[in-house]
Amino acid sequence: MSDRGPNNSMEQPDSSPRPAAVTFVTTEHFTLQGARSQTIAESTGRASMFLGAVSGGLVALGLIAAASNVGAAFYAFGLILLPTLAFVGLVTFDRALQSGVEDHGYTRRIERLRGYYFQYAPELVGYLLSVPQTERLRIQGVGGGGRWQGFLTVAGMVGVVTAVLAGSAAGLLAAVVSGHSLVAALVAGILVAVVALLWLMRYQRSAWERISTARLFPDE
């Protein structure tokens, strides 16, 4: 396989790039790599904070349940805690998705710079990863993967937990309203969780479709 630059040419240019251009390109490459690291760190950090909050909240809910013998205090605390955790999950999901989209854009820009390297130094083809321009992101595992890929992202994981929290809150509310009916609680909880999960996954897929078709450069 061969890697092609922006001009789809592997031939040696008539002249070497100016030293200033080389400096600009390498600096931009380094900056983009740093930006990618920041997006990854932010996504994992936010997800860790969210999961920590969920873990602590559920432990507290369990203690309240034991202390109140699953009485009024348990339901009151649960109806406050679970929607709050679901909201935290929603904003974490949205920001993790934004970070993923930003990382995708940085990756495309880095691959553009790699095309510049191969254009002016084609002898590097035997030493650096060299694939056709249209296959670069797929080879790196960025994008693709079908519908299941959405569940493998940080945003997808947070979305699943958030949907479960929303369903749990709805089930708890249904149990209170229906006089502690298990059937009503299960039906309401499952329905809300499924609807929330489908909406979040569709929202994420739409965001990825938009960024995948967006043109960052005129000749794309």
Question: What is each PLM-predicted segment?
Answer:
Residues 2-12, 79-120:
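Membrane-anchoring/interfacial helices and their immediately flanking loops
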Residues 10-14, 40-50:
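Alpha-helical transmembrane segments of integral membrane proteins, especially early/N-terminal helices
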Residues 12-29, 34, 92:
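Short, charged/polar, low-complexity loop and linker segments
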Residues 13-23, 104-144, 217-220:
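Solvent-exposed, non-transmembrane helices and loops of integral membrane proteins
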Residues 29-41, 144-146:
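Cytosolic juxtamembrane amphipathic/interface segments immediately preceding
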Residues 44-98, 146-206:
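Alpha-helical transmembrane segments and their immediate juxtamembrane boundary regions
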Residues 202-220:
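Cytosolic/matrix-facing juxtamembrane and C-terminal tails of multi-pass cellular membrane proteins
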